Amino acid sequence: MAQPSYNIENVYRAISTINGYFSEEKQYGATIQRTDPIIHTYCHYGNTKGKCGNYFQMASSGVIHLLKKLKGMSGLECDKLAEYAILWLSYKLAIKPNNNGIDLNHFYTNYIIKNNDYNKKIKNDDSLTYKAIIDTKKDFMNIKEIYNFSYLFSILFYLYNVNNPNNLKCTNNSNYPENFANKFKELNEDSNINGNTSYRKLLSTLSDDYDNLKKIYVNNKSCNFPLLPQIEPKKSLAQNPAEISGRGFEQISGQTSEVISSSSSISTTLIPGLSVVSAIPVFLGIAYKTIYKKKIKKNNEENEN
């Protein structure tokens, strides 16, 4: 696979920086929110004064911060910017306590379209807006498969932010590289994914990022990085793409058990001091179970009525 023209480590370093601008977690029954004042920069909805009112508005602002930071890097085209932004966004939504079932499509409608900052022309590029960048991958917003990719992203995000890669004991942490490789193989063989050009490109991006990790962990003998299969285009055997893209968050809730099952292999053992990505081990295993249990319960109650 061709080596990307941009610095992958700098990309994940930038994502880590933006990720640290705000967080929310449950502690002893209380919701603790931590924010950096900079996160309020891009929160202009209607006639508001520009201060983010909730976690989702902060996530929206964070996406612009990330796009702005990545856009200054050499070799990153708009579609690649959108890929990383949406991967990070889906991760950030999934780890939020009490997400209330807000998915990417809902987020796009309420926190991107309605955020005035997305439609402002980007400095030194009068023909482009941040919304236009996101729209290059808008199809990711309404399809369940993006959450499978987010599982892969969460592992990469964790591994790229380990303070000392040579000290990470992969055998004590459910062997993240092997988990990545197994899930990658599964997605690569899924006709819903390998039959879609955009998804194959995203698999290629994650594959490049994974291969780059091998160089970082080359001296760590406990971390085995299996070879990833070649990404081969195949004819999709899935239903009409329009039907897939039209399915909402609740409609796909019953189909996520496989994702939840595979995610449970991520260990809850953390590297001391790794606060930036401390939520990653529960990324799917807890956050998704909580979200989807509520959704399934709601659906069952509606069906009974």
Residue ranges and their predicted role:
Residues Q251-N305:
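C-terminal single-pass transmembrane alpha-helix
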